[in-house]
A protein has these predicted regions:
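Aromatic/His-enriched, Gly/Pro-containing loop or helix-boundary segments
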Residues: 141-165
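Short hydrophobic alpha-helical segments enriched in small aliphatic residues
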Residues: 4, 20-23, 30
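Short, Lys/Arg-enriched N-terminal segments with co-localized hydrophobic residues
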Residues: 26, 30-46
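Short, charge-rich patches within N-terminal targeting peptides
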Residues: 8-14
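A short, small-residue-rich loop immediately preceding and capping a beta-strand
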Residues: 158-180, 191-195
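Short hydrophobic targeting helices and cationic amphipathic motifs
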Residues: 18-20, 294
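Catalytic or ion-coupling anion/metal-binding cores of large enzyme and transporter domains
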Residues: 48-96, 100-102, 107-126, 133-134, ...
Length: 515
């Protein structure tokens, strides 16, 4: 629904109605039904009269003393009816830093349309994000982890400062996903999370490739195994569309978490960013948040100890990012839940690894979506006894109720049954010992060698380690240790993807260890 520009105050606003895009194709692939209802049905909310006397926005819109505030709203073309409705903050992490975020603005407009259609007044704003793919391998990466806190803080301040009643958060790149979910839990206003979608895979020499292949190609190039022309050809085709990194890196890991934990609509995390069906999910999210206001369902009603355990289970089952072990305790902290690193690791230890996703496996997010998506993954884990089905979600129903009509698709190769997992324990594990008394996290998805002993080779920053790797100044059997790169020491806890990928690119991934 597209609303024309408002006329002068008091005049009736002209409205033009357009049919929503046909999204049926996004729910069926061949004979496999991925969802039992279109997304607009999932988020449907009856037209509701809201009592603003109990909502935060009453402080900026109700009573004669708020006439100056209302004059600002009239200046933006708002009508008396819109001022009298609940105010919903629609926040996106849109920017032009990287493809991860450029589809968010489009989806935010659809979310606003959903809010409007369900008797709400959307108020759009943006916050920052730092894109790891651009920040990686240099001083810029020190900005990444702290950006999570800045995102949460900035959203909190904007929501509180303007007395918004509810929130829809749209995120694309790594730290922005937990940042927005942390803000939702801190504010505890009715909220729906919306992932912006993953990138399409590129194609190089007849094979699907992602940006990780380019990182690894840097190592191959340094070793003299890839000429300049081939490296350039790969970099030009690896990232063909908008969207976040296609493998099960931080963005897709936390997108899966958003569904597992109950803050996102079912199946909304799966469709790639270019798909028009994302707009339908965004519109449904707008309607869903109005339903949450009407029923006073808040993030801390949804995110409980049980739902946090569900989230950790999904991280392990998908061979997800080790960052999940950082973000889940931070989210739990915002909700007042005790859920630390080693408690997360205990769940990792008893969860089967069943999703064959890059970087440890073969497939990307688009493939899992077409195979059955996050709902099929969740149903598989639920039936295996690995999830709590009684957790509330943003649909107003429990996780088990959302999954009632989902069945396992045997004609796909991405998601394995729990009775025949890729490995019996999770793709991410926690360790504790003399080397790391407070605990450590290791991504073991795709690794064959789980024990290593060697000579320590110490570096005091990432740049020194990468330079040594680039000139192959190390040998098989070394344990490469990069010191002073923690949250305080760095500061910022930079991720060592450039160094890790270069080692793999040189063919030495199983010959050295990296700490």
């Amino acid at each position: 629904r597209v609303h024309g520009a408002a006329n002068k105050a008091g005049q009736k606003k002209q409205k033009m109605d357009f049919h929503s895009p046909d999204v049926a194709d996004s729910f069926s692939h061949g004979s496999i039904i991925l969802a039992t209802k279109p997304p607009e049905a999932i988020g449907r909310c009856a037209m509701t009269e809201f009592d603003k006397s109990k909502l935060p926005s009453r402080h900026v819109s109700v009573g004669p003393e708020r006439a100056p505030h209302r004059s600002y709203y009239y200046a933006m073309g708002m009508t008396e009816e819109e001022i009298a409705q609940p105010f919903v903050g629609v926040v996106s992490c849109w920017n032009e830093a990287a493809p991860c975020n450029i589809a968010l603005m489009r989806q935010a407009q659809a979310a606003k349309a959903g809010v409007k259609s369900a008797s709400g007044t959307p108020r759009e704003f943006c916050t920052i994000t730092v894109t790891d793919g651009i920040a990686m391998g240099h001083e810029g990466m020190k900005s990444s982890l702290i950006s999570r806190e800045v995102i949460a803080d900035s959203v909190e301040l904007t929501m509180r400062g303007h007395c918004y009643d509810a929130m829809i958060g749209l995120a694309g790149c790594d730290k922005s996903l937990p940042g927005l979910m942390m803000a939702m839990l801190r504010l505890n206003v009715p909220s729906v999370f919306m992932y912006g979608g993953s990138i399409m895979p590129g194609e190089f020499k007849g094979k699907d490739v992602t940006v990780l292949d380019v990182f690894e190609a840097v190592g191959q190039h340094a070793a003299g195994n890839m000429p300049d022309e081939e490296l350039h050809e790969l970099e030009c085709v690896a990232c063909p569309s908008a969207g976040a990194c296609g493998g099960q890196f931080t963005a897709n890991t936390m997108a899966c978490v958003s569904e597992a934990i109950g803050l996102a609509l079912p199946n909304s995390a799966g469709a790639p960013a270019p798909y028009e069906s994302r707009d339908a999910y965004a519109e449904a999210s707008g309607k869903a948040v109005m339903n949450l206001i009407a029923n006073n369902i808040r993030p801390r009603d949804i995110v409980t100890r049980k739902s946090m355990e569900n989230a950790a289970t999904v991280v392990a089952a998908t061979g997800g990012s080790t960052n999940g072990a950082l973000h889940l305790p931070a989210m739990a902290h915002e909700a007042g839940i005790d859920f630390d690193l080693m408690q997360v690791a205990e769940i990792f230890k008893k969860t089967p690894y069943i999703a064959d996703l890059k970087p440890g496996g073969q497939y990307v997010a688009k493939d899992m979506y077409e195979a059955g998506g996050v709902p099929m993954l969740l149903k598989t884990l639920l039936e295996g006894g690995y999830l709590h089905g009684d957790c509330l979600t943003v649909t107003g129903k429990t996780l088990a109720e959302n999954l009632e009509e989902i069945t396992f698709n045997p004609d796909q190769k991405v998601i394995y049954p729990v009775s025949n997992p890729i490995t019996p324990t999770g793709g991410v594990v926690g360790l504790k010992g003399s080397l790391a008394p407070d605990g450590a996290i290791v991504k073991v998805a795709g690794m064959e060698k789980l024990q290593f002993e060697g000579t320590a080779r110490c570096f005091d920053c990432e740049e020194d380690a990468f330079a040594a790797v680039e000139r192959e100044d190390y040998k098989a059997g070394d344990v490469i240790i990069i010191r002073y790169e923690g949250p305080k020491g760095g500061p910022g806890m930079r991720e060592m993807l450039s160094t890790t990928s270069a080692i793999y690119g040189q063919g030495n991934g199983d010959k050295v260890a990296l700490i």
